[in-house]
Amino acid sequence: MSKFFRRRKFCKFTAEGVKEIDYKDLNTLRQYLTENGKIVPSRVTGTKSKYQRQLATAVKRARFLALIPYTDNHDV
């Protein structure tokens, strides 16, 4: 038997009953971005594939409208 118990991942959007992810909800979108601005994969976050696709679309829309940056590291 293993010593450590890995906590089961669950989809926060399913638990909260979200129907569609809004691109204007920046606090939610930032939870699913890395510090470099990349979208975190669903195998890490535990989101269902339906919501992961909506999340990716919402992040891309927010980036296009300059609500969130494409990258956070700008070393000049």
UniProtKB/Swiss-Prot annotation:
The keyword Magnesium does not apply. Keywords: Ribonucleoprotein, Ribosomal protein, RNA-binding, rRNA-binding. Part of the 30S ribosomal subunit. Forms a tight heterodimer with protein bS6. One of its GO terms (molecular function) is structural constituent of ribosome. GO terms for biological process: translation. It comes from Stenotrophomonas maltophilia (strain K279a). Belongs to the bacterial ribosomal protein bS18 family. Binds as a heterodimer with protein bS6 to the central domain of the 16S rRNA, where it helps stabilize the platform of the 30S subunit. HAMAP family: Ribosomal_bS18 (MF_00270). Pfam families: Ribosomal_S18. NCBIfam families: S18. One of its GO terms (cellular component) is cytosolic small ribosomal subunit. This is Small ribosomal subunit protein bS18.
